[in-house]
Amino acid sequence: MAESAPARHRRKRRSTPLTSSTLPSQATEKSSYFQTTEISLWTVVAAIQAVEKKMESQAARLQSLEGRTGTAEKKLADCEKMAVEFGNQLEGKWAVLGTLLQEYGLLQRRLENVENLLRNRNFWILRLPPGSKGEAPKVSRSLENDGVCFTEQEWENLEDWQKELYRNVMESNYETLVSLKVLGQTEGEAELGTEMLGDLEEEGPGGAHPAGGVMIKQELQYTQEGPADLPGEFSCIAEEQAFLSPEQTELWGGQGSSVLLETGPGDSTLEEPVGSRVPSSSRTVGCPKQKSHRQVQLDQECGQGLKLKKDTSRPYECSECEITFRYKQQLATHLRSHSGWGSCTPEEPEESLRPRPRLKPQTKKAKLHQCDVCLRSFSCKVSLVTHQRCHLQEGPSAGQHVQERFSPNSLVALPGHIPWRKSRSSLICGYCGKSFSHPSDLVRHQRIHTGERPYSCTECEKSFVQKQHLLQHQKIHQRERGGLALEPGRPNGLL
């Protein structure tokens, strides 16, 4: 029964028929199903890939945006710094611009003041330093009082020489006040300076001159009481005397006063009353008895006299003319002029009274010691002995040869005749013209030209030019006598 069951089953299978329509339908269904599933999967994968790409692009854009924001922040910080710097620079520029505007205003004021001064023809005020605020230069009251104000019409009516005189007077007054430091001071100091000037002017012997000429105000006069080597002992600030009238000139020259004429060291101090002067631009002042030994140019005559003060540094005084001297030798030279020995003339210079340096008389020493061989003479016996040794060393023929070759007055001779420090130009060979620093070198050189060999050996009759060569040759003979063999290749002597 068991065996028959599978057989039956086989039979059933064989008995069922297979239709062709059922198989293709199932295959198509399956294939369509698989195709749809594959398509859906690929679309999903593609969508996922597209999303991933979008994400990557968005991430890149986000990173670029972050970088841009960082750079923008940096630029913003730099811009803030630049804005601060520009603000500081603008503040400095504004400050500079403000100072420039102020200076421009001052320059405009000065230009206006200069134009006004040029219109009024006050050219001398242009030399004054301008004010701190650009105002016109301030002139002291004394200078304003000295000046004379002219209108344009009056100035045009003046002649050229009057205009020039006015300019010179105002310039001189200005220079005087500047030198006295009156200008540029406060009003109190300026008034004090003018009061001092007025007091000094009132003390002077000269007052106001009578009318009849152009009056020129005399300024301050100083007397320098310092040492004698100062540039000037007195100075007088005054105008030229050519503007004074003849009457004023006589009155000017007739005042009795004295003038101090200080000189440098070694010169004399002269005194002469002013009353004996001649009113001229230059005059010679000197000793009363000898007309003068020093010419003093008086370019400007001073109205105030200066009293003579004795100088303690000049103790020697002449009893006749009362001139003092610094040195006793100057006084002795001056006294000779009074006695008539060596009267000094006005043409003699002022250095004639100065002490001259004493020079020792250079006496020639007699040459007493003479050489018998070459007839040379010497002042010392030691030099002669040294010279004779040279003759003994050079042999008997050397003295005769030297005597024939050199004249007695020649500079080229043996070492005993010439000092060691002679110039090379004096030691020249007469044969070839070569120069030598020592006479012995010249003698050896000239033996080459003459062929002379004064040093000869007594044993082998060889002769040599120098004594040193002879001594070396004699050592060879000494070795031969001692039985010492000569070294091979060594010469027997120097010929």
From Swiss-Prot:
GO molecular-function terms, A-Z: DNA-binding transcription activator activity, RNA polymerase II-specific; DNA-binding transcription factor activity; identical protein binding; RNA polymerase II cis-regulatory region sequence-specific DNA binding; zinc ion binding
Keyword terms: DNA-binding, Metal-binding, Nucleus, Repeat, Transcription, Transcription regulation, Zinc, Zinc-finger
Gene Ontology, cellular component aspect: nucleoplasm
GO biological process per UniProt: dendrite development; general adaptation syndrome, behavioral process; neuromuscular process controlling balance; neuron apoptotic process; regulation of DNA-templated transcription; regulation of transcription by RNA polymerase II; response to alcohol; walking behavior
Ranges of compositional bias, category Low complexity: 16-25
Pfam families xrefs: KRAB, zf-C2H2, zf-C2H2_6
Lineage top rank: taxon: Eukaryota
Location relative to the cell: Nucleus
SUPFAM superfamilies reported for this sequence: beta-beta-alpha zinc fingers, KRAB domain (Kruppel-associated box)
Zinc finger (C2H2-type): 316-338, 369-391, 427-449, 455-477
CDD domains, A to Z: KRAB_A-box
Keyword check for Metal-binding: yes
Keyword Cell membrane: no
Segments for region (Disordered): 1-29, 264-290, 337-361, 476-495
Annotated ranges, domain KRAB: 141-219
Family per similarity comment: Belongs to the krueppel C2H2-type zinc-finger protein family.
Task of the protein: May be involved in transcriptional regulation.
Name this polypeptide is given: Zinc finger protein 212
Organism for this UniProt entry: Homo sapiens (Human)
